[in-house]
Protein backbone atom coordinates (compact mmCIF):
# COMPACT_ATOMS: atom_id res chain seq x y z
CA UNK A 1 0.00 0.00 0.00
CA UNK A 2 1.51 3.32 -1.04
CA UNK A 3 1.54 6.55 0.96
CA UNK A 4 -1.27 8.25 -0.99
CA UNK A 5 -3.52 5.22 -0.69
CA UNK A 6 -3.01 5.15 3.09
CA UNK A 7 -3.97 8.83 3.33
CA UNK A 8 -7.08 8.51 1.16
CA UNK A 9 -8.37 5.40 2.93
CA UNK A 10 -7.61 6.97 6.32
CA UNK A 11 -9.65 10.04 5.36
CA UNK A 12 -12.55 7.89 4.16
CA UNK A 13 -12.57 5.82 7.35
CA UNK A 14 -12.32 8.89 9.57
CA UNK A 15 -15.13 10.77 7.85
CA UNK A 16 -17.53 7.88 7.37
CA UNK A 17 -17.09 5.95 10.63
CA UNK A 18 -19.28 8.27 12.70
CA UNK A 19 -21.50 9.74 9.99
CA UNK A 20 -24.61 7.71 9.07
CA UNK A 21 -23.29 6.81 5.61
CA UNK A 22 -21.44 3.50 6.27
CA UNK A 23 -17.66 3.35 6.55
CA UNK A 24 -17.53 -0.35 5.62
CA UNK A 25 -19.34 0.28 2.33
CA UNK A 26 -16.89 3.00 1.34
CA UNK A 27 -13.82 0.96 2.27
CA UNK A 28 -15.15 -2.06 0.36
CA UNK A 29 -16.00 0.04 -2.69
CA UNK A 30 -12.75 1.98 -2.93
CA UNK A 31 -10.65 -0.98 -4.15
CA UNK A 32 -13.44 -1.87 -6.60
CA UNK A 33 -13.63 1.66 -8.00
CA UNK A 34 -9.88 2.37 -8.06
CA UNK A 35 -8.43 -1.05 -8.82
CA UNK A 36 -6.38 -0.97 -5.62
CA UNK A 37 -5.70 -4.18 -3.76
CA UNK A 38 -7.87 -4.75 -0.70
CA UNK A 39 -6.30 -2.84 2.18
CA UNK A 40 -6.22 -5.95 4.36
CA UNK A 41 -6.92 -6.64 8.01
CA UNK A 42 -3.80 -4.83 9.25
CA UNK A 43 -4.82 -1.52 7.75
CA UNK A 44 -8.38 -2.04 9.00
CA UNK A 45 -6.94 -2.40 12.49
CA UNK A 46 -4.92 0.81 12.17
CA UNK A 47 -7.85 2.97 11.06
CA UNK A 48 -10.17 1.41 13.64
CA UNK A 49 -7.71 2.30 16.39
CA UNK A 50 -7.49 5.84 14.98
CA UNK A 51 -11.25 6.35 15.04
CA UNK A 52 -11.54 4.69 18.46
CA UNK A 53 -9.02 7.12 19.95
CA UNK A 54 -10.84 10.01 18.28
CA UNK A 55 -14.21 9.28 19.88
CA UNK A 56 -12.63 8.60 23.28
CA UNK A 57 -10.70 11.87 23.16
CA UNK A 58 -13.65 13.94 21.93
CA UNK A 59 -15.96 12.61 24.66
CA UNK A 60 -13.20 12.14 27.23
CA UNK A 61 -15.16 13.79 30.07
CA UNK A 62 -18.28 11.72 29.39
CA UNK A 63 -16.28 8.52 28.94
CA UNK A 64 -14.42 9.13 32.20
CA UNK A 65 -17.68 9.68 34.09
CA UNK A 66 -19.33 6.60 32.59
CA UNK A 67 -16.34 4.40 33.42
CA UNK A 68 -15.73 5.69 36.95
CA UNK A 69 -19.42 5.76 37.90
CA UNK A 70 -19.80 2.25 36.49
CA UNK A 71 -17.05 0.99 38.80
CA UNK A 72 -18.54 2.91 41.73
CA UNK A 73 -21.93 1.34 41.09
CA UNK A 74 -20.42 -2.14 41.42
CA UNK A 75 -19.03 -1.28 44.83
CA UNK A 76 -22.24 0.49 45.91
CA UNK A 77 -24.50 -2.18 44.35
CA UNK A 78 -26.74 0.55 43.01
CA UNK A 79 -26.63 3.15 40.25
CA UNK A 80 -24.31 6.06 40.94
CA UNK A 81 -24.11 9.23 38.83
CA UNK A 82 -23.94 8.19 35.16
CA UNK A 83 -23.60 4.46 35.86
CA UNK A 84 -27.04 3.59 34.47
CA UNK A 85 -26.08 5.08 31.12
CA UNK A 86 -22.68 3.40 31.24
CA UNK A 87 -24.19 -0.03 31.85
CA UNK A 88 -26.75 0.65 29.11
CA UNK A 89 -23.83 1.08 26.70
CA UNK A 90 -22.42 -2.27 27.84
CA UNK A 91 -25.79 -4.03 27.49
CA UNK A 92 -26.32 -2.45 24.07
CA UNK A 93 -23.00 -3.84 22.85
CA UNK A 94 -23.91 -7.48 23.52
CA UNK A 95 -26.16 -8.15 20.46
CA UNK A 96 -23.52 -6.99 17.96
CA UNK A 97 -20.82 -9.03 19.71
CA UNK A 98 -22.96 -12.18 19.52
CA UNK A 99 -23.89 -11.52 15.89
CA UNK A 100 -20.26 -10.85 15.04
CA UNK A 101 -19.09 -14.12 16.58
CA UNK A 102 -21.79 -16.19 14.88
CA UNK A 103 -22.02 -14.49 11.48
CA UNK A 104 -18.74 -12.68 10.82
CA UNK A 105 -17.43 -15.16 8.24
CA UNK A 106 -20.72 -15.09 6.33
CA UNK A 107 -20.88 -11.29 6.47
CA UNK A 108 -17.28 -10.92 5.26
CA UNK A 109 -17.90 -13.18 2.26
CA UNK A 110 -21.48 -13.44 1.03
CA UNK A 111 -22.55 -9.93 2.04
CA UNK A 112 -19.54 -7.96 0.79
CA UNK A 113 -21.28 -7.34 -2.54
CA UNK A 114 -22.27 -4.17 -4.37
CA UNK A 115 -25.89 -5.30 -4.66
CA UNK A 116 -26.12 -5.72 -0.90
CA UNK A 117 -24.55 -2.30 -0.33
CA UNK A 118 -26.98 -0.58 -2.71
CA UNK A 119 -29.97 -2.24 -1.03
CA UNK A 120 -28.94 -1.42 2.53
CA UNK A 121 -27.93 2.10 1.53
CA UNK A 122 -31.43 2.84 0.22
CA UNK A 123 -33.38 1.00 2.93
CA UNK A 124 -31.58 2.71 5.78
CA UNK A 125 -31.74 6.09 4.08
CA UNK A 126 -35.53 5.78 4.13
CA UNK A 127 -35.56 4.61 7.76
CA UNK A 128 -33.21 7.41 8.82
CA UNK A 129 -35.42 9.98 7.08
CA UNK A 130 -38.55 8.55 8.70
CA UNK A 131 -36.96 8.54 12.14
CA UNK A 132 -35.75 12.11 11.83
CA UNK A 133 -39.03 13.39 10.40
CA UNK A 134 -41.68 11.53 12.34
CA UNK A 135 -40.31 9.61 15.31
CA UNK A 136 -37.88 11.77 17.28
CA UNK A 137 -39.11 13.05 20.61
CA UNK A 138 -37.81 14.80 23.69
CA UNK A 139 -36.21 11.92 25.62
CA UNK A 140 -32.59 12.46 26.66
CA UNK A 141 -29.63 10.28 27.62
CA UNK A 142 -30.85 10.17 31.21
CA UNK A 143 -34.07 8.46 30.06
CA UNK A 144 -32.29 5.53 28.40
CA UNK A 145 -32.99 2.20 30.06
CA UNK A 146 -31.75 -1.31 29.39
CA UNK A 147 -34.71 -2.09 27.12
CA UNK A 148 -33.77 0.91 24.97
CA UNK A 149 -30.14 -0.22 24.98
CA UNK A 150 -31.06 -3.70 23.76
CA UNK A 151 -33.17 -2.29 20.91
CA UNK A 152 -30.38 0.06 19.83
CA UNK A 153 -27.95 -2.84 20.26
CA UNK A 154 -30.00 -5.00 17.90
CA UNK A 155 -29.86 -2.18 15.36
CA UNK A 156 -26.08 -2.12 15.81
CA UNK A 157 -25.99 -5.86 15.14
CA UNK A 158 -27.95 -5.39 11.90
CA UNK A 159 -25.39 -2.74 10.96
CA UNK A 160 -22.75 -5.45 10.56
CA UNK A 161 -24.24 -5.83 7.08
CA UNK A 162 -22.12 -3.66 4.72
CA UNK A 163 -23.82 -0.46 3.63
CA UNK A 164 -26.10 -0.25 6.64
CA UNK A 165 -23.96 2.14 8.75
CA UNK A 166 -23.51 1.46 12.45
CA UNK A 167 -24.13 5.09 13.38
CA UNK A 168 -27.05 5.34 10.97
CA UNK A 169 -28.77 2.24 12.36
CA UNK A 170 -28.25 3.14 16.01
CA UNK A 171 -29.25 6.79 15.58
CA UNK A 172 -32.37 5.71 13.68
CA UNK A 173 -33.28 3.27 16.46
CA UNK A 174 -32.74 5.99 19.05
CA UNK A 175 -34.99 8.40 17.17
CA UNK A 176 -37.76 5.79 16.92
CA UNK A 177 -37.42 5.29 20.69
CA UNK A 178 -38.25 8.96 21.14
CA UNK A 179 -34.76 10.33 21.81
CA UNK A 180 -33.96 13.79 20.56
CA UNK A 181 -31.32 14.11 17.84
CA UNK A 182 -28.44 15.00 20.14
CA UNK A 183 -29.16 12.21 22.63
CA UNK A 184 -29.65 9.58 19.91
CA UNK A 185 -26.38 10.65 18.31
CA UNK A 186 -24.36 10.79 21.53
CA UNK A 187 -25.62 7.37 22.62
CA UNK A 188 -24.56 6.05 19.22
CA UNK A 189 -21.09 7.56 19.71
CA UNK A 190 -20.80 6.04 23.19
CA UNK A 191 -21.81 2.62 21.85
CA UNK A 192 -19.15 2.93 19.16
CA UNK A 193 -16.39 2.70 21.76
CA UNK A 194 -16.75 -0.90 23.01
CA UNK A 195 -17.78 -2.35 19.65
CA UNK A 196 -14.91 -0.64 17.83
CA UNK A 197 -12.50 -1.81 20.52
CA UNK A 198 -13.84 -5.36 20.14
CA UNK A 199 -13.44 -5.20 16.35
CA UNK A 200 -9.89 -3.92 16.73
CA UNK A 201 -9.08 -6.75 19.14
CA UNK A 202 -10.42 -9.36 16.71
CA UNK A 203 -8.29 -7.91 13.91
CA UNK A 204 -5.24 -7.85 16.16
CA UNK A 205 -5.72 -11.52 17.06
CA UNK A 206 -6.14 -12.35 13.37
CA UNK A 207 -2.85 -10.63 12.54
CA UNK A 208 -1.07 -12.44 15.37
CA UNK A 209 -2.48 -15.88 14.55
CA UNK A 210 -1.89 -15.67 10.80
CA UNK A 211 1.51 -13.94 10.93
CA UNK A 212 0.32 -11.21 8.56
CA UNK A 213 3.05 -8.88 7.29
CA UNK A 214 2.78 -5.39 8.78
CA UNK A 215 3.39 -2.23 6.75
CA UNK A 216 4.14 -0.09 9.78
CA UNK A 217 4.49 3.21 7.92
CA UNK A 218 1.29 2.75 5.92
CA UNK A 219 -0.62 1.68 9.02
CA UNK A 220 0.73 4.59 11.06
CA UNK A 221 -0.22 7.10 8.37
CA UNK A 222 -3.70 5.59 7.98
CA UNK A 223 -4.26 5.55 11.73
CA UNK A 224 -3.18 9.16 12.25
CA UNK A 225 -5.21 10.43 9.29
CA UNK A 226 -8.31 8.51 10.40
CA UNK A 227 -7.92 9.92 13.91
CA UNK A 228 -7.69 13.53 12.72
CA UNK A 229 -10.54 13.27 10.23
CA UNK A 230 -12.77 11.35 12.67
CA UNK A 231 -12.45 13.91 15.44
CA UNK A 232 -13.20 16.66 12.91
CA UNK A 233 -16.21 14.76 11.56
CA UNK A 234 -17.64 14.25 15.06
CA UNK A 235 -17.27 17.95 15.84
CA UNK A 236 -19.04 19.20 12.74
CA UNK A 237 -21.69 16.47 12.85
CA UNK A 238 -22.79 17.59 16.32
CA UNK A 239 -22.40 21.28 15.47
CA UNK A 240 -24.69 21.04 12.44
CA UNK A 241 -27.07 18.44 13.87
CA UNK A 242 -29.91 20.70 15.00
CA UNK A 243 -29.62 22.98 11.97
CA UNK A 244 -29.73 20.31 9.27
CA UNK A 245 -30.83 17.11 11.00
CA UNK A 246 -30.22 13.84 9.17
CA UNK A 247 -31.33 14.98 5.73
CA UNK A 248 -27.85 15.66 4.27
CA UNK A 249 -26.94 12.03 5.01
CA UNK A 250 -30.24 10.72 3.67
CA UNK A 251 -29.68 12.56 0.40
CA UNK A 252 -26.04 11.42 0.21
CA UNK A 253 -27.04 7.78 0.71
CA UNK A 254 -29.66 7.94 -2.04
CA UNK A 255 -27.27 9.64 -4.47
CA UNK A 256 -24.57 7.07 -3.62
CA UNK A 257 -26.99 4.22 -4.30
CA UNK A 258 -27.92 5.66 -7.70
CA UNK A 259 -24.26 6.18 -8.66
CA UNK A 260 -23.36 2.62 -7.63
CA UNK A 261 -26.27 1.20 -9.59
CA UNK A 262 -25.23 3.11 -12.72
CA UNK A 263 -21.61 2.02 -12.33
CA UNK A 264 -22.16 -1.67 -11.65
CA UNK A 265 -25.48 -2.64 -13.24
Curated annotation (Swiss-Prot):
Domain of life: Bacteria
Topology class, membrane: Multi-pass membrane protein
Predominant place of localization: membrane
Biological process according to GO: cell wall organization; peptidoglycan biosynthetic process; regulation of cell shape; response to antibiotic
GO CC annotation: plasma membrane
Record bears the keyword Transcription regulation: no
Disulfide bonds: none
Gene: uppP
Taxonomic placement: Bacteria, Pseudomonadati, Pseudomonadota, Gammaproteobacteria, Alteromonadales
Summary of the function given for this chain in its UniProt record: Catalyzes the dephosphorylation of undecaprenyl diphosphate (UPP). Confers resistance to bacitracin.
A Pfam short name: BacA
Reaction catalysed by this enzyme: di-trans,octa-cis-undecaprenyl diphosphate + H2O = di-trans,octa-cis-undecaprenyl phosphate + phosphate + H(+)
Family recorded in the similarity comment: Belongs to the UppP family.
Organism, scientific name: Idiomarina loihiensis (strain ATCC BAA-735 / DSM 15497 / L2-TR)
GO molecular function, one term: undecaprenyl-diphosphatase activity
Other noteworthy facts: Bacitracin is thought to be involved in the inhibition of peptidoglycan synthesis by sequestering undecaprenyl diphosphate, thereby reducing the pool of lipid carrier available.
Protein name in the entry: Undecaprenyl-diphosphatase
TM annotation in the entry: 1-21, 39-59, 87-107, 110-130, 144-164, 187-207, 217-237, 244-264
HAMAP family per the UniProt record, alphabetical: Undec_diphosphatase
Classification via InterPro entries: UppP (IPR003824)
EC number: 3.6.1.27
Keywords, comma-separated and alphabetical: Antibiotic resistance, Cell inner membrane, Cell membrane, Cell shape, Cell wall biogenesis/degradation, Hydrolase, Membrane, Peptidoglycan synthesis, Transmembrane, Transmembrane helix
Localization, UniProt: Cell inner membrane
Amino acid sequence: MDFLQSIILGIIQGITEFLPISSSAHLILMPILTGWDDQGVGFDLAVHVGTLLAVILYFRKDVSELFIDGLRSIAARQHVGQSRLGWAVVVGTIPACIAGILLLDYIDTALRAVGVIITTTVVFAVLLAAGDRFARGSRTLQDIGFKDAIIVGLAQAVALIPGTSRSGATITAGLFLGLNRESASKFSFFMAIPITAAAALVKLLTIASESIAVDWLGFLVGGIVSFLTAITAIHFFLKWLNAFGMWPYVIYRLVLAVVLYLLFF
